[in-house]
UniProtKB/Swiss-Prot annotation:
Presence of keyword RNA-binding: no
Homology family: Belongs to the ponericin-G family.
Biological process (GO), any one: defense response to bacterium
Pfam families associated with the record: Ponericin
Example of a GO cellular component annotation carried by this entry: other organism cell membrane
Location within or outside the cell: Secreted; Target cell membrane
Function of the protein: Membrane-perturbating peptide with multiple activities. It is insecticidal, since it induces contractile paralysis in insects (L.cuprina) during several hours and death after 24 hours. It shows a relatively strong and broad-spectrum antibacterial activity against both Gram-positive and Gram-negative bacteria (MIC<20 uM). It is also antiparasitic, since it potently inhibits the larval development of the major pathogenic nematode of ruminants (H.contortus, IC(50)=5.6 uM) and reduces the motility of adult males of the other nematode B.malayi.
Name this polypeptide is given: M-poneritoxin-Nc3a
Keywords tagged on the record: Antibiotic, Antimicrobial, Membrane, Secreted, Target cell membrane, Target membrane, Toxin
């Protein structure tokens, strides 16, 4: 169900969020 998907998304963001933000910041700077 959508709740399972939501939990997976939350876990993914918890793991990858900082990485993605760093990449976005680097892209914005360059």
């Amino acid at each position: 169900g959508w709740k399972d998907w939501l939990n997976k998304a939350k876990d993914f963001i918890k793991e990858k969020g900082p990485e993605i933000l760093r990449a976005a910041a680097n892209a914005a700077i360059n």
